[in-house]
Amino acid sequence: MSSKGQQLAIDYKQTEWKTPDVYNQLRGLMKDEVEIYAFCLEFLMNIEKDSTLFHSALSYVNEKDFSQLVKIAIDILKEKESAVAESVIEYAGIQLPHILHPYLDDLLVLNPNGDSYFADYHWRNCTSAQLQPYLAQFLASSTDLETKIKLFNCLVESRDITTIESLIPHALELELSTYVSSAHYIDGYLEGVGLCREYGKVKRYCSDQTYHILFEPKYLNKPSAVHLNRTDHPTWNGVPLTNKYKVGGYLAEDENNPFMHIITLNPIPEGLPIRLSQLVLGCHLRELNENGVVFYQHDEQGNPHKIGEPIVIEWVEEHAMVPTEVSIVPTDSRWAFQSWASANSRENLFRIGGEPSWVQSGEVLTCPISGEKMQFIMQLDSEVPDVQGGEVYYGSGGLCYIFWCDKTKVSGYIMQHT
């Protein structure tokens, strides 16, 4: 007799999304580690067509069982192509990259997920010792250019600064891209993984400490879309810190270009590179969506003052978020890195600290006063309710990224969307 999880996968194989109440059936398994693993195992072993239902389920598989799925997926890929097995590698690389580290050689040969943006995610957090053989292969004169480019991408994805600084002088001598210079290629790749070059050194532009912002469930949820329920995923849950933070509303109303309040950080969450006792973050969202970037300098009380005169925006009419209070929760290590596309609207991408979840490529702001690279401090997702009954969108529904220069007390905003 099949278990509930196994049976759901069997049913899905027959009728796919016509399976009665399929997502609610999956929701019923999410807190049962045995059943969610049974579902994923049956899906991996016996279903050829990949599915977001399977992707959703992987977030609830414990590390031990995920390691077993990885082993099976690699064995499958050694025998045949499998989009489902490739998804196991993709999501393990995002959530638990260390469980893939014993298979680095196999994965280089198999190259699951091909040239996709997430193909090398599993190299994240490899140690210098683990990387040494691959660095040596990259440096070897006998290694062909195509292999060197692949190894460069993998080694940078590790985020190991010692290895990367050994890599860069040699990478600069290669034709890494036919579209941009090698220097631009290197800088672009670094900024996509939380790093940047400044004054000849590689450094992180984001903090290690990460928090997720938690709203009251009814503030964000759309009851008609069960698969987008913003209470299920682990990133929408957790034990919050005691402090509450005010978000939304206006700092200054202007019919042409209102100054919208984002959040007041009081106190400043631990681990952020901010020496003020409080920081009021706000932006002219219409101008941000029209021009792509805005900057503010803050006074000693943390209040923002726009750098440059506000401009009249005629064609964009965004409104402020509905005022509310939010909590923050320290992020579990499994969710320290999140991919915007792979999250697929299931995960909480309202984050403070940590690495950005870039919609496009990395784009670290330079402070307009100090001329130095700024530190990433926060990101906001779209589809927050606004005061006019609509929703706040960054572009067509992307993310807003907030940067900070502590030397000059300047905040900067950019947004990316598809």
PLM feature spans:
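Preference for intrinsically disordered or flexible, low-complexity segments
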Residues: 1-418
